């Protein structure tokens, strides 16, 4: 982006705070008792066994959805499901199911899956990425409901997705199998139609209604729901027949809420996020972790209470799509330089919330962001800044925290706090978190 932002000297001159006045920092690590599935491929095979295939003849094509999120165990789940289908005599395939992600193009969606380790070579089956859709009916608002032609051409479809609280809205159905049916299989047109309808009615109910129509009018045989623990590992995998999805998904969502990763601290002046990205969250940063939603018609969370957020970088897998950047208050100039506005704006229009595409206050380096936080958080003394730094919102249990936060966490049975040290900078850049 060809914009000339102020340099560090100009910005640091807006206050008289020196780096030596910043608080000392310590590593903090929260320990959790987490259950996880050791063999996800085997769990996927068991899930396939719970789905009804009686109506399908040998050799039938059964397509499994694959989304754009960086779900650690999804490649293994897909491998197990594909192998199980082949062993049953079916012809498995995978459908790229990610709304408008990947620039809303066939090649872009294929590249998105490749970046996540989901390839034809690994799965030994075809991956279909056509953006073509057909209408299968209208919802109660009179709006078209779309399904990918690749799904309609298959003999059977399995909705595979992580079930978790959504970053935009809350209700009995959030991110999961129903959303995969509506937005994933709906491709760009379906996602745009859904998000637009969601601005006029209850988002969760719109998804539920549309998912019911899609299950009725397309060859969906069921779904495989995956629930992650706070360390982003599969803790539950379940096959859900098509006629049980609407009843079972809300129950699985309640289970997922109990596993939701959160910060170990409720109140911060500044949260430093090393990476935001589309494979981390659809909003770049998980709104349930940062305590910000900024979505039309949705209330802001009561906690955590974070005054300022600084985003340091964007992941390569995002391909410059910085949707969600508007959730931050400060952003490193390198992030702005890497933005691909074509993809970002297509995605933001589809999602229906332009405020999340706003480019925050842009800083040339990390030190400048920290010094400016002293002037923009209401803290009287720099040494009292309550700061936490995390790699991403997928890893909120591993932090670097300022001394006031370290004092608060020290002594908690579930948190280990290390030695306090001054921050180290090289040409204004923080040293690596690890």
Where are these regions (language model features)?
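Membrane helical hairpin/interfacial module
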Residues: 71, 75, 81-119
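Flexible, glycine/charged-enriched surface loops at secondary-structure junctions
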Residues: 54-59, 217, 221-224, 259-271, ...
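Glycine-rich phosphate/diphosphate-binding loops that line cofactor/substrate pockets in enzymes
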Residues: 47-63, 86-89, 264-265
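C-terminal non-catalytic interaction/assembly regions of soluble proteins
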Residues: 288-292, 296-434
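Conserved, well-structured core segments that form the ligand-binding/active-site neighborhood
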Residues: 147-277
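N-terminal amphipathic/basic leader segments beginning at the initiator methionine
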Residues: 1-43
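An acidic, phosphate/nucleotide-engaging active-site surface
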Residues: 108-172
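Short glycine-rich or small-residue beta-strand-to-loop segments that form or flank ligand, phosphate
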Residues: 61-70, 93-98, 388
């Amino acid at each position: 982006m060809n914009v000339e932002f102020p340099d560090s000297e100009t910005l640091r001159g807006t206050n008289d705070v020196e780096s030596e006045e910043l608080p000392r920092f310590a590593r903090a690590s929260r320990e959790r008792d987490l259950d996880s599935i050791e063999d996800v491929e085997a769990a996927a095979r068991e899930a396939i066994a719970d789905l009804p295939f009686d109506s399908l003849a040998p050799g039938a094509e059964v397509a499994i959805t694959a989304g754009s999120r960086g779900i650690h165990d999804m490649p293994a789940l897909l491998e197990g499901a594909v192998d199980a289908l082949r062993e049953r005599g079916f012809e498995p395939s995978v459908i790229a199911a990610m709304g408008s992600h990947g620039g809303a193009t066939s090649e872009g969606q294929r590249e998105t899956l490749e970046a996540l380790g989901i390839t034809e070579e690994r799965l030994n089956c075809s991956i279909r990425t056509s953006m073509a859709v057909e209408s299968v009916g209208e919802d109660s608002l009179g709006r078209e409901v779309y399904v990918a032609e690749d799904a309609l051409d298959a003999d059977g479809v399995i909705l595979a997705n992580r079930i978790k609280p959504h970053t935009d809205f809350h209700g009995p159905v959030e991110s999961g199998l129903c959303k995969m049916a509506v937005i994933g299989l709906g491709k760009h047109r379906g996602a745009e139609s859904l998000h637009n309808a969601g601005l006029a009615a209850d988002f969760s109910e719109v998804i539920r209604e549309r998912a019911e129509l899609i299950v009725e009018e397309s060859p969906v045989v069921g779904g495989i729901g995956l629930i992650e623990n706070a360390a982003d590992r599969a803790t539950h995998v379940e096959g859900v027949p098509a006629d049980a999805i609407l009843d079972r998904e809300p129950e699985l969502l309640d289970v997922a809420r109990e596993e939701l990763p959160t910060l170990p601290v409720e109140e911060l002046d500044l949260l430093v996020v090393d990476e935001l990205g589309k494979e981390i969250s659809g909003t770049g940063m998980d709104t349930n972790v940062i305590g910000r939603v900024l979505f039309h018609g949705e209330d802001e969370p009561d906690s955590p209470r974070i005054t300022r957020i600084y985003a340091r970088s964007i992941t390569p897998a995002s391909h410059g799509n910085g949707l969600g950047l508007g959730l931050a208050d400060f952003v490193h100039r390198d992030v702005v330089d890497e933005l691909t506005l074509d993809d970002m704006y297509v995605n933001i229009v589809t999602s229906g919330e332009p405020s999340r595409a706003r480019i925050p206050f842009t800083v040339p380096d990390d030190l400048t962001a920290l010094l400016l936080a002293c002037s923009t958080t209401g803290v009287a003394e720099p040494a009292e800044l309550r700061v936490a730094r995390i790699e991403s919102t997928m890893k909120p249990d591993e932090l670097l925290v300022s001394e006031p936060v370290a004092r608060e966490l020290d002594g908690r049975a579930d948190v280990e706090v290390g030695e306090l040290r001054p921050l180290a900078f090289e040409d204004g850049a923080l040293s690596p978190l690890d």
